[in-house]
Amino acid sequence: MPSSARLSVLGLAAALALVLNAHAESRPRYGGAVMQTGPLADLLVDGDPLIRSLHRRAGGNAGLRQLARLRRMTHLLRFLRQTFNQLATRRHEPHIIPLPRGTERDGRGAGLLTAARGALGHWISIRDGAFDRYQVITPTSWNASPRDSAGTPGHWEQSLIGVPVRDPDDPLEIAHVIRPHDPCLVCTVHFLDAGGQTRHRVRLGV
């Protein structure tokens, strides 16, 4: 959740600069810092008064994340109406003008947008008219990123640190923290005791 702007409104130069290495998709960072993305992050950045007020009172808890998912839908409905009205005036124009085969140029490009789960980015480089490299960083990659080379934990791990678990054999609190992020994956969390033995496994996600 960048403090000043959404990922989807970055300029092309800034967008291309985000991809630092081949491992960026597994532990992405923004300016070296851990970020979160999703409806709550979007509404906080957009300055939604209700969400900001509730966030100041109680922080980014599970209930507020669920409310933000519903709240953002009301914003999207208004945006869709505006978009459809604009498209209606240009419905006879082509959506894309393809280049003649063989005239493709070498280059790099990036496409950034806000998907249902948050910031989504696609990066591509073209050489000799063919794809040379392609990379995608999904919203879940931002939120679920593992510790980086500096030892900084990702957003999910930071969210779980210090969460009390009443029953280690039925750690519902872990699910309550992660599921409101709407993870686009299936992950299994292994709980180890002090002796390093697996005590419990929890399957999360879709």
Give the residues covered by each predicted segment.
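Metal/cofactor-centered catalytic core regions of large enzymes
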Residues: 1-206
